[in-house]
Structure formats: structure tokens, C-alpha cells
Amino acid sequence: MTGKSMKEAILDAAEKRVRHAGYSKMSFRDVAKDVGIKSASVHYHFPTKSDLGTALVERYKDHFSQKLLQIDTTNFADALAQFVQLYDAALVMDQSICLCAALGAESMGIEKQIRAETGDFFQVNIKWLQNLFRLHPTKATGLEATDIVASLEGAMLLASTTGHRTYFQKVSDRILHHTKI
């Protein structure tokens, strides 16, 4: 592997599989095949599927949090548009959905630790929006952080399931319309 550790390559392959087919369909054998190693080598880095799933969500949450920190919040409309763009990028990436949307859809059948980490991802997003609303109280009238996150995640699932990206676009346009009022 040039420039990337085997552990990162395994995480990349596992994330792609979860985002496309779901956590329950991801197997160590398939991930190993994607990376070009034996499944025992995947177990070396991640002894259990739960360990791999937890590491996936932690990494995804960290990357997303870093992107949130890069958003300049001095202009409410621009900041909200950049937030929505992060979700849009997750939908467009490999024509799949946000990792945590995929895991959230399977939440009743995944391990407790993965479910907790997935919930933490959503809380990071909600808290970021709440902070933005506190910075711009007159601009945020009528907006709720949980409504925005739930709407974007739901629209992502709907767009992915039906193949109609316009569903996501309609929801994001409605959210951003509030910045023009």
C-alpha cells in the first residue's frame, strides 16, 4: 500500500460496502477481497465486526466534524448552505448515502456501541446547528436543528432508495429558503 495504511484501506473498503449495501451485508471476506488480503488479516486489525463498525463510525464522525469546523459561521446563509452541502456531498459520493444514514436505517439490528456512535454523529450535527442558531438568532427563526438533520438524512434515504435525487434537492432547497426570508 502506498501512502495509505492497511487499516485505512480496510476502513475505506468497509465504508464503501456499508454505504452501498448496509452493515448487515458487509463481511470480512468481502472487505478482504476488496483490499486484496485474507480475511484473517482484517481480523488482525479489527478482531470483530463490531470493532470494525465502531472504528468506521468514529472515523466518519471525526472527518465530518473537521469539515464542520472549517465552515465560517459569520454569515448564517453561507454557513447553512455549506452544512447542507456536506450532506449533498455524502449523497453524491459513489452514488451512496451518508454512512450514519445507512447505519441509522439498520439501528435496530446493529451492535449497541455502533448505534451509540451513530447517535453521537447526529448529536454533533445537531449541536453544530444549534450553535449556528445561537450566533444568528434572528436568522434562525422557525428552524430547528433536529428537523434539519432528520430532513436531510430522510431525504438522502428517499433519494437513494427511489433513485430520484430531486427529493433531496427539494428538502435542501426548503431548508435554505429560510435564509432568504
Q: Where does each model-flagged region fall?
A:
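N-terminal intrinsically disordered/low-complexity leader segments
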Residues: 1-5
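Short hydrophobic clusters on alpha-helical segments that form packing/core surfaces
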Residues: 10-18, 60, 87, 152
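Hydrophobic alpha-helical connector segments
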Residues: 55, 69-96, 145-148
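Short, basic, alpha-helical segments at the C-terminal edge of helix-turn-helix-like DNA-binding modules
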Residues: 58-64
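Hydrophobic/aromatic-rich alpha-helical bundle segments in the mid-to-C-terminal region
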Residues: 112-123, 134-179
